[in-house]
Amino acid sequence: MIGKITKKLLKNIPGGSHTYSRGFDQFSSNAPEIFYKGKGAYLFDNKNNRFLDYGMALRAVSIGYSEDKINKAAKRQIDLGNNFTRASITELEASEFFLKTIKNANMVKFAKNGSSAVTAAVKLARAFTNKSIILRCSDHPFFSYDDWFIGSTEIKKGIPKEIYKLTVNFKYNNINDLKDKIKKFKNQISCVVLEPSTIGCPNSNFYSGCCGNFECKRDFKKENYLMEVQNLCNENKIVFILDEMITGFRWRLGGAQEMYNVKPDISTFGKAMANGFSIAAVCGKREIMELGSIEKKGTERVFLLSSTFGAEMSSLGAFIETVKFIKKNNVINSNWLNGYNFIRTFNDVSESEGLIKYLYASGVPCSPYYVTLDKKGVPSLMLRTILMQEMIKEKIIFPNFISICFYHNKDAIKKTRNALQKAFLIYKKAVFGKTSVYLKGNSIKPVFRKFN
């Protein structure tokens, strides 16, 4: 059941959007097809209906849509010219500001999207080690739209086997699996690529998700899975790449690496670092990063990132102001608290409806997730779509993932509680009755599937 606006989008744009996570197959059929503005934690559709949003531009907005101070900072840079023939003062200031924030990095290069940044990290690793194999964590959903990653998913069409056979998957929080892969491809591995954390903590002794506490009760300073990964990489002369697109400027200001006490060789950042403005970064140790430089005469060159708009001043200005706003307003702590309140509210309502076995929220509080199970305890995309559908009726965008922002405050949580109470009544009927009766339109689908 495709709407008129979606049909127009599909006619002009392959997939109907510029990232597959925004596709019509990721939302219930009653979801707004298009939006025209956002403010705080809310989006407005083309009919001026207001929706509380838990997608927050695919986690790119951690403060709120259209934050005045950040917008003004970007506009100031536009008025100055936005993009020059050589480097700008803003470019220098942003690089210095970034390196003061991300303590483990000696150099940084900016980009416009995370895919470019992570692929640049992989290229640096291959150049530094003169090795080809990439070990990437299969439990982390996305690293890049480039062939080295997409070829390791179900969607291999258009990618030569010679490329994707060089990417090998390993499991998160399973250090023995990583050891086995390193042993199997001994002296062939350029890098290990993973996110610091997704739905659970990096703990090698157990994998029980997140403890769920506002203040994490686990001690990561002495030992954790990421430390073991780091040690393995060091022992085997493999470049340790930490992709902090989601965790950066969200878990801690200095990234999850600050929280989990690790020092990656290369890190990548993006998403929340400029509150929705297009910017990403690859950063790391000088001895690796400087391979992409040009001043050392006679050294073989590595063609790193080279982008006309990579240092666009409006995005860099927004980045600087975003970090200042985060510091001044204690955004990191607020988002952890907002997410904790979301999880607690979700589970309180589910418990009261007798659904907690089939429907619950969990995860790191600043980036929670929810689980939808059928009466046999099996994950159900149909039930997930029904929940999304019922939340839309209450004017709440409730996507596959939950992205918490600064403005998901007590009022937003109260609105969410009221909506959940109504939505869960339908969900309960769908769990114990004929599920398909309660779904209008089609179920959502996984992004990474071989066929449409």
What is the predicted role of each segment?
Residues 1-452:
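Conserved N-terminal phosphate-binding loop of PLP-dependent enzymes in the Aspartate aminotransferase
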